Amino acid sequence: MTLVESIDSLQAWFDEHVCQQATFKVPTDNNITGEAQLIHPASFALYVPARDRIPPNVVAPIPSICIQLMEGEDKLTERNTRLNIRLCLAVWNPGDQTGVDFTPVPDPSNPVGVKYTQGDDKPTYTRNLDGWRDIMNFVDLVRLELRKHDIIAGHRIVKEEPIKFGQFFQDDALWDSYPYWHSWITFSVEYGGMIALSKECESLL
């Protein structure tokens, strides 16, 4: 398995097993007081693109989960490869917005294709700092899925070592990017693969 195949398959796995289970608010920085809309998080490999560079099938770069390869090693005698993975999670939540509902209502005029409403014709907004709860719930969902599975996308989760998680810091201070909320998770996976024999070894066979 090549590194590209590994990263692609891991991204697809998290998209199916994590992203499709969660919904978070779509960032509307220019109209925070409006009705909130919910979408499944997007999944990205290595980098989160800027808003003007997202793929056509992605509504917004956040909410999202980004699968990053931090380090790898080939264990030549054991004929397997180990990858150290970091997941970067991000959500947006400026506070309470009326109209948030997990029951979608079709709306062709909306870029998401649906809207979420509680029937309030006059959306209101109350700023708060509870968005951290969304990112912690996102982290918990990923942790749960990693605990439930031993093999993901053909890779064995190295459960002999802990899954680590936390928040980002800058200059020893918690990274404050309100109304955006971020967190990370690290873990390792392994997979076996055929290792090409050197000419010296082939001559001995």
Regions found by a protein language model. Give the residues of each.
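Intrinsically disordered, low-complexity acidic Ser/Thr-rich regulatory segments
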Residues: R53-V59, D121-D130
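Short, well-structured alpha-helical interface segments that form or flank functional binding sites
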Residues: E5, I62, R82, R133, ...
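Solvent-exposed amphipathic alpha-helical surface segments
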Residues: H17-K25, H149, A153, M194
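Small/polar-rich, solvent-exposed N-terminal microdomains that initiate assembly or binding
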Residues: M1-R79, E200-L205
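Oligomerization/assembly interface segments of phage tail-like spikes and tubes
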Residues: R79-D96, P104-T124, V142, S177-G193
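Glycine-rich, small/acidic residue-mixed loop/short-helix segments
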Residues: G99
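A hydrophobic membrane-anchoring alpha-helix module
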Residues: S188-S198, L204-L205
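Acidic-leaning, charged glycine-interspersed low-complexity segments
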Residues: T126-G192
